[in-house]
């Protein structure tokens, strides 16, 4: 699915990338792991007919962060969603700042404080600033003990979508 995967270059050097697939997503039963979405080969759950773009991975080289590369990747994803007339973007969002707070609060409390603006998380705050809403916390989403395997469930709704 090349139209849903993006690489940002500085000359011939890859400095950022965003990957995703079109999926069915059940917002009534949101608990899942990234592996559930990817399937065994990483794309087995993809179909051009599915209504949601699931952001499976996104990253920017540390030296290029704060330069608009992440925003550009989100805009490319949104452009893909509009082009294919999908309902929006859904993803599990990492919460790297939680590692500094996990001894004193749950992931749910941490995310609530980030959403309220009481705490800053480099990823979640950035996603909110880019029009995403946080729907909750996914437990066991990734194998990352530094954040107890937790991530956020985020959604961006395509206001240009037409059924």
Locate the predicted segments by residue.
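Short loop segments at secondary-structure junctions
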Residues: 11-12, 23, 63, 157-161
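C-terminal/domain-terminus segments
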Residues: 72-80, 135-163
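Short beta-strand micro-motifs in enzyme catalytic cores
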Residues: 4-6, 51, 148-154
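Conserved acetyl-CoA-binding loop-helix of GNAT-fold acetyltransferases
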Residues: 60, 66-82, 90-91
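Conserved beta-hairpin
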Residues: 4-18, 33
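Conserved acyl-donor/pantetheine-binding loop and adjacent beta-alpha core of acyl/acetyltransferases
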Residues: 18-57, 75, 95-122, 128, ...
